[in-house]
Curated annotation (Swiss-Prot):
SUPFAM superfamilies for the chain: RPB6/omega subunit-like
Listed name of the protein: DNA-directed RNA polymerase subunit Rpo6
Protein keywords: Cytoplasm, DNA-directed RNA polymerase, Nucleotidyltransferase, Transcription, Transferase
Main location: cytoplasm
Location within or outside the cell: Cytoplasm
Domain of life (superkingdom): Archaea
Family: Belongs to the archaeal Rpo6/eukaryotic RPB6 RNA polymerase subunit family.
Single GO biological process annotation from the record: transcription by RNA polymerase II
Amino acid sequence: MKIGPPWLTRFERARIIGIRALQISLGAPVLIQVSEELSDPITIAEKELELGLLPIIVVRWTPEGKIQEIPIKYLKLRPQL
């Protein structure tokens, strides 16, 4: 990774979870087994992200205009504070 840290920032994590939760609430197929305790779209999206199942690419850029596309499977998840 040439741009940014080797982990998902809290802003990237929030955006990914929000986008995926919206997709799930609109009827997108879920990538994990859903139980009664995992019925909330946000909880499902968080679990999918933790398991590394989301085929999403994070785009990072600098003020100079350089862009780097990074699949989230190459980014580490930081523990929640």
